[in-house]
Amino acid sequence: MVTMCGGHRPENFLHQVLTEFGEELAGEGKSEVGGGAPRSYLQVASAECWAAAPAVHVGEPVHAGGLHTERGADPVIGLYLVHRGGACQTPTVGNRQTPTLGIHARPRRRATTSLLTLLLAFGKNAVRCALIGPGSLTSRTRPLTEPLGEKERREVFFPPRPERVEHNVESSRWEPRRRGACGSRGGNFPSPRGGSGVASLERAESSSTEPAKAIKPIDRKSVHQICSGPVVPSLSTAVKELVENSLDAGATNIDLKLKDYGVDLIEVSGNGCGVEEENFEGLTLKHHTSKIQEFADLPQVETFGFRGEALSSLCALSDVTISTCHVSAKVGTRLVFDHYGKIIQKTPYPHPRGMTVSVKQLFSTLPVHHKEFQRNIKKKRACFPFAFCRDCQFPEASPAMLPVQPAELTPRSTPPHPCSLEDNVITVFSSVKNGPGSSR
């Protein structure tokens, strides 16, 4: 019977197992070595630090001399053990003699050195051992006084590798990462890169117990940036969302300013109702809106926006600053937002009733999109007056578009009364060509 010496110490338990198997090897090894005093498994494991390093878990069914375990049953580990003779005689090849290796030198792969595998299957009340070697196979079932705990099993499976390794991999003809007797890659030799074998064994353990997940959730920052792109794909969409936001607030006068064709700055000011102070926090958060509260409210929506995505997406794509003053407030407020729609600066600011939204460096958080936007913005500028006349109708207001560049362009506006798209286009482009007040 194998008892747990030292209070469930796994190394003591392995010490007993290796000792008993070492006694059998001592009887078998004399004939193999040819008269030399053989070294037992335990002696090899204590003298050579790399000799008793464990392999990974056996993932496939194991059948070896009465040792039988299926996948997912009792945990099975394999220990690669090296047995060699103590005295190395000088072999003779023809008329040439090879020099005798020193006692501390690692022998080359000869008949005096053999690789064996010790399989241990831990059950609830017993441990089954199987020794696989060249021409010898031994299997036993040994009861345990008490079953091993999870922590002790882990220490048995993956003991810490000693710091000092008396094995030169470069001069060895043994392949460091060949397939072992347990059917798993790895082995009892140090990594040729000098890394710790324990970390690789732990990775092998996790890969064998849990399958690697190829589908993983995207982090919230990336999701916010990815989802904001389709909401505001272009400059015209950004202007449209800001203008519609002012219309929903009841604005009758909307000013639109573009700096460097909208690359540096987009500013939309409207004389709407403004925003109350208690609503500042949710002003630019994703899916925060005052238009609806649930899906059933959609048939009653009478505004342009109701999803609560426009300002949040603009925050994710640019630097947004909002200046507002509610009808009930005595002084305005200037709010600076980060890319997540959170307020990072809040200061009193003189502002008339309404709200002004400033968008700086549109698409700056998307480098490829920003570069494409800068390259094509001048080409799209020619279509902007037409889009302005088509999308922005002001039946009860008199919006004006005052260009900053070039200076020779004159102010142009649409009539304050409802009219057709053709009338708007003729009015705007005739004012650009002939000046204000020209006839059609």
UniProtKB/Swiss-Prot annotation:
The Histidine kinase domain is annotated at 230-364
Annotated Gene Ontology cellular components are:
mismatch repair complex
Q: Which CDD domains match?
A: HATPase_MutL-MLH-PMS-like
Q: Give the signal peptide range.
A: none
* Gene3D superfamilies named among the record's database cross-references: Histidine kinase-like ATPase, C-terminal domain
InterPro entries linked: DNA_mismatch_repair_CS (IPR014762), HATPase_C_sf (IPR036890), MutL/Mlh/Pms-like (IPR038973)
Q: Where along the chain is composition biased (Basic and acidic residues)?
A: 164-178
Give a brief account of the tissues where this protein occurs: Highly expressed in kidney, spleen, adrenal gland, ovary and cerebellum and to a lower extent in liver, esophagus, stomach, duodenum, colon, bladder, uterus, lung, pancreas and cerebrum. Not expressed in heart.
- Spell out the PANTHER family in the cross-references: DNA MISMATCH REPAIR PROTEIN MLH, PMS, MUTL (PTHR10073), MISMATCH REPAIR ENDONUCLEASE PMS2 (PTHR10073:SF52)
Q: Which family does it belong to?
A: Belongs to the DNA mismatch repair MutL/HexB family.
Name listed for the protein in its UniProt record: Putative postmeiotic segregation increased 2-like protein 1
Native species: Homo sapiens
UniProt lineage: Eukaryota, Metazoa, Chordata, Craniata, Vertebrata
